[in-house]
Amino acid sequence: MRKTEMLRIIALKKQTLINKVSFRLTFAEALEIGVKNAPSIIGCVVLWLLTIWVPYINVGTTIAINMLPIELAKGGVISPLGIFDAKYRKYMGDFLITTGLMIIPVFIASLFMIVPGIVLSIAWSLAYFFLFEKKKNPMQAISASNEATYGSKWTMFFVLLAFVVAAYVIAGIFAWICAAIDAGFITFVVMLALVAVIMSISLAINASFWRQLKDNVQ
């Protein structure tokens, strides 16, 4: 039995009526999903950058990038061409409304010593996924995200904090080594690969959050 499956079983045994995020399971799943999908995510980002100037298409691909964790949570390897699927453009209006409904309150909350803004950001971090995957309207999606993350916000915060710190430390070490070698092309390739893996694991963390919490709200 794979380690991630064992961790999932342990996490499930600890769950009661409300599913909660497991620190260990999140990182185990994120590494497994992220490393496996790193090349595909590079392809997604490259295609997104190449088409960001194309009106209408760019909205769909931007939505697709934000929705990648949903596909990653299914456990397979994603296709970079999937960001052009018309289903993403179908949700353009709801996506923009949801974004607007979240940005202003988070900004206002951040004025109160930043912490409330962080709490709201985490509480609403699954809103897009509920909007797209469970067909909620914008207000329902935000409310569902808040309900689904109840009891898990601190764990999610420390997962994200640990990831950011680890990413900065690892990037710093690689940058120092590359600077010592003083080989421009090698530095470029290494740092590009590192950025790709970091981006991939970041999306995979959100995928794990979604996988663990999505059933808290029907």
Predicted regions, residues:
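Gram-positive cell-envelope targeting signals
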Residues: 1-2, 9, 22, 160
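Juxtamembrane "helix-exit" motif on the non-cytosolic side of transmembrane helices
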Residues: 173-181
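Interfacial aromatic "cap" segments that immediately flank transmembrane helices
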Residues: 20-50, 81-108, 120-173, 204-207, ...
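Polybasic, lysine-rich low-complexity intrinsically disordered segments
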Residues: 3-4, 55
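Short, contiguous pre-domain boundary segments
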Residues: 4-18
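Selective recognition of hydrophobic, aromatic-rich stretches within alpha-helical transmembrane segments
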Residues: 48-78, 106-143, 182-217
